[in-house]
Amino acid sequence: MQFDRLLTEARLATMVAGDDGYGVIEKAALGIKDGRIAWIGPMSEIPGEARETERLASRWVTPALIDCHTHLVFAGDRSDEFERRLGGESYESISRSGGGIARSVEATRAAGAAELAAGALTRIDALAQEGVGTVEIKSGYGLTRESERTMLRAARGVERASGMRVSATLLAAHAVPPEYKGESGRYIDEICIPLIREAAREGLADAVDAYCEGIGFSPEETRRLFIAAKAAGLPVKLHADQLSDTGGARLVAEFGGLSADHIEYTNAEGIAAMAKAGTVGVLLPGAFYALNETKKPPVEAMRAAGVDMAVATDANPGTSPLVSLLTAANMACILFGLTLPEAFAGMTRNAARALGLHGEIGTLEVGKAADLAIWDVERPAEIIQWIGRRPLHGRILAGEWQ
């Protein structure tokens, strides 16, 4: 076998499910051909040669990390709301007074796709320096048919400019815009549902999301949105049960949803539905921390039910101003009780599943994309242990060094 690139003297954490949690192969090699993993195994069994061979001097190799829930495309600043929350005002109060998402909507509507993409690129660079190779980016700060499409075009532009894989999610049902105040159902019918059809037809969105909450959209409105998404051939996911138990996790599982995200208030019925549907529970400790919440997601119950759990930054200008996936993983361990292998799976294997990309990325397996992160650490646990340190040696995406 002739490889394009052969990595030798490596320690691999393949993240294929196994007894040690990491799928470790010591004294290993990995062969790449045509941007994909062509062979993995012990160095003593390398089945061919390569045009380029690189010795990694016992460095660890993992799948490139995946941030499966972000709001990286936006304009404007909401640091004053941070000050208001520090003064004791709740996020719900700020939102109802015209702040929160509505503030970002005003600024984002005034920006073009190029400006939005340029801002997102500065944020995505911080993730790249931590070994991230795939990022999900949501719309949701436009809330008109044209401005939401502008946000999705910006996300596609980020993919082209950054070299990273971007999964674009239509989140028009993020908040009710001012011009539809008190008429959320009419907004769903007149803006969100037609927009789903347009985004699917134009190839702008890979999935549809909604914010199902008392300050967002009702379960009935979310259901109408999901019916339209499925009819358009787009998978669904949901901001579910963050501030109250709305039955969101159960609802998105009913539609075979990719993920239920936040899920602090998800009940036993919702967990059972997620387990049955294979819906991933996405933990967002950055928002939990920034909002000073006390209700933790039901990690132990999801673990017992066999629900796959992912970890993401929820990077956004208001409730989770976090562009460090490694910090999010650290928080998920300390605040929510994930084990280190669970947190690592949450940034790789399970994050890929939350995006519907588990056949392409998330583990080191023959046939998958050669998206790799190489680390200067003694053990994989060290990658998550430290806050603020970036132990990344380098990234390989689609078989090429970045």
From Swiss-Prot:
One of the record's GO molecular function terms: zinc ion binding
TM helices/strands, residue ranges: none
Bridged cysteine pairs (disulfide): none
EC number(s) recorded for this UniProt protein: 3.5.2.7
Gene Ontology CC annotations of this record: cytoplasm
Annotated Fe(3+) binding sites: H69, H71, H239, D314
Cofactor(s), names only, from the UniProt record: Zn(2+); Fe(3+)
Keywords: Cytoplasm, Histidine metabolism, Hydrolase, Iron, Metal-binding, Zinc
Top-tier EC class: hydrolase
Residues that coordinate or bind Zn(2+): H69, H71, H239, D314
Residues involved in N-formimidoyl-L-glutamate binding: Y141, N316, G318
Subcellular location per the Swiss-Prot or TrEMBL entry: Cytoplasm
Pfam families named in the record: Amidohydro_1 (PF01979)
Xref: PANTHER family: IMIDAZOLONEPROPIONASE, IMIDAZOLONEPROPIONASE-RELATED
Role this protein plays: Catalyzes the hydrolytic cleavage of the carbon-nitrogen bond in imidazolone-5-propanoate to yield N-formimidoyl-L-glutamate. It is the third step in the universal histidine degradation pathway.
Similarity annotation: Belongs to the metallo-dependent hydrolases superfamily. HutI family.
Name of the protein: Imidazolonepropionase
